[in-house]
């Protein structure tokens, strides 16, 4: 067999990646996990379990729901519907087809169900199987996830955002003294299930414990304890210890000495040892727990107390008469002086009392005695009355309701997470499979609540990430599925009971529409299913990694307090403390940290390196917030020697509660993997983040997501090293699926012959069709450009084509421009930005925006609408861009008002006279009246038509334009097929040639004689078909040729079949909405150059609006004549405290000057003035050992590398581990620049130097999608409001500028009476006045008469609505 990897001499593409000088000191041992893994894992792996055999599927996601809902039985148990397995069919359309046709990308779900019919003997009740029917039932189309972690719903890309919610389990907290006026802490506990009723326990101000179910009326907690089967004695024994007082004649009572029950106080009586009679402490002396422990350790076991000590104690069992066994006092009753007298009189020797003291309060006992319910039945009925007021309470109904509330798995579910949390908090060991409440749970919740009241233990922190978990896509959709399947269950039971079960098949019972509508509703309307932010690749990634506390089952932004929104110590390495929206959602919508991942229970985990005996290992362990609390964790920048031993006497470590302690190296358990793990992806792209104020960093990370993809992309000179990861994981770039050799490349596609050998040894072919000028969700342009050349060898996952906002496989949101910090004629007042004309001229910040316009031809009551060029009352000039069908040509330049698609609609006719009817009957039908309803370019839009799509209903004949577009698409498919076949044929026939050469022919084509030995020249003279006719003597060779032929034919057949299927899809009509005959979509691309009013920003939260574009000759320039591109205000820095931008500017200045130095060295080398060693030495000084592989290569390779950095040297300064001020100075020194980073600038207008040195450097700036073209418009005449008759407001309504109250004051202050009158009348709501004014303008006169404004009439009507009749009386002036 031929090896596909023979003769690969080309350099692998991975060496073509951009090299950055990295300032990071910390050695990375863990790679950044795939940034969209959270979406894909949750949906595909955990919910759908795609591509997993039925037998190997775990009981989770879809499998677990189907298992829990089925089997379904009818009421009489005759029919039983069981679930066997499920599988997905292939989706009808692929992702691209769904986007173009406005369809949802989904796969049909087929569930195999088994219907068993039983025969029940009426006399004996025995059941026998009567029949079994198994059938595959269609359950609807289930949306599939694209490879980029998104869903396509009705043609638009959507993202399902993960939700943060409170974890199921039990939580204890108090009211912080806010409820009671005294400031007393009222403790409470809440059991939150995943599904089911909430259970609350709470103390009131009198220290009685209550409980509530679903926030209904409260009841005594002991009512619930009785309802779960506990009696008074069991309650007392569970919650209290008991101590026995023994009577010692004439001395008092002896009781066991327990030092734990002693608190510091002064004794009211002597402390006497009951066994020896010794007085240990006199009355009035102080005893402390420490002293008590000392006495206990030297043998004090029992102490003597007086008779009066028993008064006020509570009995721990019933007090009985020793002779008659009569109950004198019940358990829990207080011992009074009278009762003590009875005890003495009856000579009762032992009295058992409850241990109630300051460490163990009488709360349960008091609640028990306040509660009127004495048995389980009355307690259950009491609960029933609260939950079902008005219904008669009987014990059966009450018992059933109580059981269903908390103990029925169908109605109550704590979930596995809830059970784990419950076990951990209550110190229980109940199986994780039991996800309902147990009696032990309820008993222990009350126990812990009482202990908290007694001052033992601490309350839970609800903002701790151990108590908040993430519900990702899979889980959110799983919940919707459950709702749908529960509805299906009800309908199945109804259908089973209604019809004749014997003749029914499983598909007759299941109505899939119920499930489809629930899933569709979730994807279309849920708050968590969002229109994807597709401004640029970073905004896509951030959207997929977003965590929202809002949404169903979450918080509401109006009621969320400061604590929920605040940064919590457990966010470290899990949730970014920087990236969150400004405004009312601050802190409620967060972003996952770069290295964070979500575990199977939904808790966020962060990676740490394990430390053993003071040595840092390379073992990476992911810990959740709960686990992290058990360890001491050092920082990533802790000093470590070459062997990994932690340096220093003490190491700064984080411990539980977010506190920092200094510990010895051997006590450290883990250290951080990298300082970058703290922040999110967007924040990790900000160089010198550590030098910026957090508020500005927040703005910086948010504004990067608003950067518009530019025509010319350029990666930042000063980056952080994460740019490549973001570009790769975003899906904007094209990655190679397999190792291979590039066979063909053009701007539209890349063809790669893979090196993955198939079973038959033939290569497969990967064809990558690139996206060209496609519209994104936010009207930005998606365009992919190839990076590879023919003959390149590419490795799997190498980037072979750049997408929007990427440059050589790195994210590139803006451009590097030369910036000076300098005030310039007030044009950079208040953060305004002054730009050079060069930026506009050379399209530095020019972007393409694509808008989509759609027209639908419908079948109306009066007849069908028609797309045509024949439009009434339209000049030929207006139709110049339309083809013969009436649709605009691709490439046409259009402006506002131009016709894009000509369309006419039938008009209703006026009634016709009998004479006209007769004439029509004789001379034939006259053409119907039609009106023009063409699609025009809206105001404010102009550009080039880049694409036209035509969709026709099935059965409707296609027009010429649709046929031409279809033909073009078929040719494209045929080219893909032919290229793939050609590569396979080349391989197959070269293999065939190798097999045949040197063998003796037995028979063959006519021109070949038997007995000849085959040579290469002989084979060249034969056609491909004739090669298969050759038969040689060697039987083994013939067998191998036979196999090759079979595989070749199969492959060719498969390619033809795939081509035919795609063509059939193209040629069959489209599924259009009801009544639509044809849909035409026109895409217009507009080039937006930078202009005054556009918003720009840096990466450090420094934003501003362009105030003026200055000619190059007027801009400040350097001594070498280089003109500054942008002038910024130096006053924008000190108060904002984002010093990172200055460091970036300095390093950018070093970058550009180092590049100049390298270019000079290369020029000198080419002129033979220096040898390559000097270049090597300089590169080694600059980059260090990172580029040894280049320096050890060929001279051409070194010069090629130097040419790549001729515009600027690329730096990486990782977040919190980047370049320090000294590093920046070192680079400036290496570039032969002043260490201040400042230079002399010359004023372009005067030619004179500025008075002071100016900070100049290359800085990375972004153009944001707040473009002035989309904000400012002008109105001459336009629509008016119906009621007030005033012009509308806003661009979308083509409205005017509001002249409000304060503006009127301004005119009054200037005494501009006529202008004011004009503003308030004819330019606003004086209807008659404005008509007269218009007439006078048309006639060329300049006088106008103002009347009564409509707002006056509105005011009069307002008075009338208040029953005040106001009349306007006009009196003639004298």
From Swiss-Prot:
Subunit structure, as described in the record: The RNAP catalytic core consists of 2 alpha, 1 beta, 1 beta' and 1 omega subunit. When a sigma factor is associated with the core the holoenzyme is formed, which can initiate transcription.
Domain of life: Bacteria
Keywords per UniProt: DNA-directed RNA polymerase, Nucleotidyltransferase, Transcription, Transferase
NCBIfam families the UniProt entry points to: PRK00405.1 (NF001616), rpoB (TIGR02013)
A molecular-function term among this protein's GO annotations: DNA binding
Gene3D superfamilies: 2.40.50.100, 2.40.50.150, 3.90.1100.10, DNA-directed RNA polymerase, beta subunit, external 1 domain (2.30.150.10), DNA-directed RNA polymerase, subunit 2, domain 6 (2.40.270.10), RNA polymerase alpha subunit dimerisation domain (3.90.1800.10), RNA polymerase Rpb2, domain 2 (3.90.1110.10)
Keyword Transmembrane helix found: no
EC number(s) given by UniProt: 2.7.7.6
One Gene Ontology CC term in the entry: DNA-directed RNA polymerase complex
GO biological process: DNA-templated transcription
CDD domains per the UniProt record, alphabetical: RNA_pol_B_RPB2
Enzyme class: transferase
Similarity annotation: Belongs to the RNA polymerase beta chain family.
Keyword Nucleotidyltransferase (UniProt): yes
Entry function: DNA-dependent RNA polymerase catalyzes the transcription of DNA into RNA using the four ribonucleoside triphosphates as substrates.
Residue spans crossing the bilayer: none
Name the record gives this protein: DNA-directed RNA polymerase subunit beta
């Amino acid at each position: 067999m031929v090896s596909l990897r023979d003769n690969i001499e080309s350099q692998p593409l991975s060496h073509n990646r951009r090299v950055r000088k990295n300032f990071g000191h910390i050695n990375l041992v863990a790679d950044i996990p795939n940034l969209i893994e959270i979406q894909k894992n949750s949906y595909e792996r955990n919910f759908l379990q795609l591509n997993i055999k039925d037998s190997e599927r775990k009981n989770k996601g879809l499998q677990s729901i189907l298992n829990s809902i089925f089997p379904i039985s009818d009421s009489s148990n005759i029919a039983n519907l069981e679930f066997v397995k499920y599988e997905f069919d292939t989706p009808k359309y692929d992702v691209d087809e769904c986007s173009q046709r406005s369809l949802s990308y989904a796969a049909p779900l087929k569930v195999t169900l088994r219907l068993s019919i039983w025969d029940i003997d009426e006399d004996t009740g025995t059941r026998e199987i009567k029949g079994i029917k198994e059938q595959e039932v269609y359950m609807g189309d289930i949306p599939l996830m694209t490879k980029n972690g998104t869903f396509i719903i009705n043609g638009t890309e959507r993202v399902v955002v993960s939700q943060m919610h409170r974890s199921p389990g039990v939580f204890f907290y108090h009211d912080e003294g806010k409820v009671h006026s005294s400031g007393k802490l009222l403790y409470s506990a809440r059991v939150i299930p995943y599904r089911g009723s909430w259970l609350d326990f709470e103390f009131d101000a009198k220290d009685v414990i209550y409980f509530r179910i679903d926030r209904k009326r409260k009841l005594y907690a002991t009512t619930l304890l009785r309802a779960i089967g506990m009696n008074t004695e069991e309650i007392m024994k569970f919650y209290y210890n008991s101590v026995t007082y023994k009577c010692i004649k004439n001395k008092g009572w002896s009781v066991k000495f327990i030092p734990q029950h002693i608190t510091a106080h002064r004794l009211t009586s002597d402390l006497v040892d009951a066994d020896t009679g010794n007085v240990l402490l006199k009355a009035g002396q102080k005893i402390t727990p420490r002293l008590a422990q000392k006495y206990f350790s030297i043998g004090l076991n029992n102490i003597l107390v007086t008779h009066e000590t028993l008064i006020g104690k509570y009995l721990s069992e019933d007090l009985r008469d020793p002779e008659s066994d009569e109950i004198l006092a019940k358990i829990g009753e207080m011992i009074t002086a009278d009762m003590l007298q009875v005890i003495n009189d009856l000579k009762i020797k032992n009295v058992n009392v409850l241990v109630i003291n300051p460490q163990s309060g009488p709360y349960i006992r008091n609640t028990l005695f306040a509660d009127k319910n004495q048995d389980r039945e009355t307690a259950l009925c009491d609960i029933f009355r609260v939950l079902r007021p008005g219904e008669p309470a009987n014990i059966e109904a009450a018992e059933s309701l109580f059981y269903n509330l908390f103990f029925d798995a169908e109605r109550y579910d704590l979930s596995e997470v809830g059970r784990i949390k419950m076990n951990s908090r209550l110190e229980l060991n109940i199986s994780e499979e039991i996800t309902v409440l147990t009696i032990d749970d309820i008993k222990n919740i009350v126990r812990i609540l009482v202990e908290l009241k007694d001052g033992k233990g601490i309350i839970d922190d609800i903002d701790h990430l151990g108590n908040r978990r993430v519900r990702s896509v899979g889980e959110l959709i799983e919940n919707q599925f459950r709702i749908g399947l529960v509805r299906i269950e009800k309908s199945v039971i109804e259908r089973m009971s209604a019809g004749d079960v014997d003749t029914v098949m499983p598909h007759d019972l299941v109505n899939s529409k119920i499930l489809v509508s629930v899933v569709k509703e979730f994807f279309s309307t849920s708050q968590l299913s969002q229109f994807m932010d597709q401004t640029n690749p970073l905004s896509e990634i951030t959207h997929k990694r977003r965590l929202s506390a809002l949404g169903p089952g979450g918080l509401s932004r109006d009621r969320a307090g400061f604590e929920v929104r605040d940064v919590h110590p457990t966010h470290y390495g899990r949730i970014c403390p920087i990236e969150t929206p400004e405004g009312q959602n601050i802190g409620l919508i967060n972003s996952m940290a770069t290295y964070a991942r979500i575990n199977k229970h939904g808790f966020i985990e962060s990676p740490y390196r394990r430390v053993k005996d003071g040595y840092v290992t390379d073992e990476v362990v992911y810990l959740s917030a709960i686990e992290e609390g058990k360890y001491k964790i050092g920082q990533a920048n802790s000093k470590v020697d070459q062997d990994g031993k932690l340096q220093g006497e003490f190491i700064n470590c984080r411990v539980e509660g977010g506190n920092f302690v200094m510990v010895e190296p051997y006590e450290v358990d883990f250290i951080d993997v990298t300082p970058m793990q703290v922040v999110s992806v967007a924040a990790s792209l900000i160089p010198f983040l550590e030098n910026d104020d957090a508020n500005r960093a927040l703005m910086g990370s948010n504004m990067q997501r608003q950067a518009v993809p530019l025509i010319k992309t350029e990666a930042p000179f000063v980056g952080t090293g994460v740019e490549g990861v973001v570009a790769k994981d975003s899906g904007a770039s094209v990655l190679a699926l397999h190792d291979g050799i590039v066979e063909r490349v053009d701007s539209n596609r890349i063809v790669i012959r893979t090196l993955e050998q198939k079973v038959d040894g033939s290569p497969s072919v990967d064809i990558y069709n690139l996206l060209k000028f496609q519209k994104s969700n936010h009207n930005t342009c998606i365009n992919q450009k190839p990076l590879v050349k023919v003959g390149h060898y590419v490795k799997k996952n190498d980037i072979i084509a750049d997408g929007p906002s990427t440059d050589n496989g790195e994210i590139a949101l803006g451009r590097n421009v030369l910036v000076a910090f300098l005030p310039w004629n007030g044009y950079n007042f208040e953060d305004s930005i002054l730009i050079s004309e060069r930026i506009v001229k050379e399209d530095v910040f020019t972007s393409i925006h694509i808008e989509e316009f759609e027209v639908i031809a419908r079948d109306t009551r009066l007849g069908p609408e028609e797309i045509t060029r024949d439009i009434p009352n339209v000049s030929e000039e207006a139709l110049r861009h339309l083809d013969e069908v009436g649709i605009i040509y691709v490439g046409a330049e259009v402006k506002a008002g131009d016709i894009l698609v000509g369309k006419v609609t039938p008009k209703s006719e006026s009634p016709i006279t009998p004479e006209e009817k007769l004439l029509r009957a004789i001379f034939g039908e006259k053409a119907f009246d039609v009106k023009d309803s063409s699609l025009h370019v809206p105001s404010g839009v102009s550009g080039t038509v880049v694409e036209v799509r035509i969709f026709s209903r099935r059965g409707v004949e296609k027009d010429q334009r649709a046929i031409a577009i279809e033909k073009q698409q078929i040719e494209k498919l045929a080219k893909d097929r032919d290229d793939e076949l050609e590569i396979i044929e080349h391989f197959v026939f070269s293999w065939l040639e190798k097999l045949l050469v040197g063998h003796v022919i037995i028979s063959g084509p006519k021109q070949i004689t038997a007995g000849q030995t085959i040579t290469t020249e002989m084979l060249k003279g034969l056609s491909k078909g004739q090669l298969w006719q050759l038969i040689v003597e060697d039987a083994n060779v013939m067998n191998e040729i036979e196999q090759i032929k079979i595989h070749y034919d199969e492959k060719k057949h498969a390619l033809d079949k795939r081509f035919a299927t795609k063509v059939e899809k193209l040629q069959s009509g489209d599924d259009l909405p009801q009544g639509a005959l044809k849909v035409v979509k026109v895409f217009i691309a507009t080039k937006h150059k930078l202009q005054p009013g556009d918003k720009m920003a840096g990466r450090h939260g420094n934003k501003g609006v362009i105030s003026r574009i200055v000619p190059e000759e007027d801009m400040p320039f350097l001594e070498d004549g280089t003109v500054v591109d942008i002038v910024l205000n130096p006053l924008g820095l000190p108060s904002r405290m984002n010093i990172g931008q200055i460091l970036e500017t300095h390093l950018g200045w070093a970058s550009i000057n180092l590049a100049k130095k390298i270019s000079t060295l290369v020029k000198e080398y080419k002129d033979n003035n220096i040898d390559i060693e000097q270049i090597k030495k300089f590169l080694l000084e600059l980059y260090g050992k990172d580029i040894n592989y280049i320096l050890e290569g060929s001279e051409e390779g070194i010069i090629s590398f130097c040419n790549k950095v001729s515009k600027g040297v690329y730096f990486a300064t990782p977040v919190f581990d980047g370049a320090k001020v000294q590093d920046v100075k070192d680079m400036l020194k290496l570039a032969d620049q002043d260490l201040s980073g400042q230079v002399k600038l010359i004023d372009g207008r005067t030619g004179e130097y500025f008075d002071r040195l100016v900070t100049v450097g290359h800085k990375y700036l972004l153009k944001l999608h707040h473009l002035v073209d989309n904000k400012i418009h002008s109105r001459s005449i336009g629509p008016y409001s119906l009621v007030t008759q005033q012009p509308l407001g806003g661009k979308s309504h083509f409205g005017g500028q509001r002249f409000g109250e304060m503006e009127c004051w301004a005119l009054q202050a200037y005494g501009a009476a006529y202008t004011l009158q004009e503003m308030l009348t004819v330019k606003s709501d004086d209807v008659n006045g404005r008509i007269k004014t218009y007439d006078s303008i048309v006639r060329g006169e300049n006088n106008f008469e103002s009347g009564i404004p409509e707002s006056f009439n509105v005011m009069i009507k307002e008075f009338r609505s208040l029953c005040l009749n106001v009349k306007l009386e006009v009196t003639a002036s004298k």
